[in-house]
Amino acid sequence: GLAPRRGACQGEEGPLPSPEEPWSEEHRDLLHRLAQQSFAEAEARGVTGKALLWELQREAILSDLDAFLAADAELRDRFGVTPHLVEVRFGLPRSADGEPGLEAAQREIPGVGTLRFRGVADRGDLDLSGNLALVLDYKTGSASSYQALKDDPIDGGKRLQLPIYTLALQKSLGEEVTVRAAYWFVSARGRYAIFPPEPVEMAQVAERFDRAVGTIAQGIAEGVFPANPGSEVRGGFSNCSYCDFNTLCPSRR
């Protein structure tokens, strides 16, 4: 379960704060030291670009980190949770440091069978009673493309991570624990918002999830991959940005 592994989130600054407590100045100083180490490593690799722009970017990052600590304190207080796990691996081989992670998430999909899912969730929090878990998936960009989650937490099957994360942790924690999940935008650009505004439970989206995943799985099994480029955006189409074959498709797709 999660509770015995709380030490994974504890570092040289000692115990984590309780849900209603803000982060300490010691925690803030540690975060800044870690950031400075990352800055130095990036500079040593020569990937930081022009000096003036890099200086501005560094200041923006440090400002985001300070705001993150404040936003995190508000989030922990709102949901009554505190961090217990980071980089929650499930269904994957042992990590480089030998950490086994959690078992793969599984779900019986009507008409398809049992599907297994693997991945990594950024963070898992628990409340003090151990009866509520909150899984957070960090996002560093804009929240504009996530607005649809207000009405549909899986966006018509485009965003399936959150229910899968709840499956993975539910299996580890037990059915008596309520497991919720949300995307959290952890920068000024994303305004530190969470989406959906109320973290999602699998029970809320089970029917939609099963239908979407079932359609995807059946299509793969039958070799059906319909072209769906999405809406036209600057420089291409919304569904094609990360496709390896984007340049092979006709421009008037």
Predicted regions and their residues:
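RecB-family 4Fe-4S metal-dependent nuclease core
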Residues: 1-253
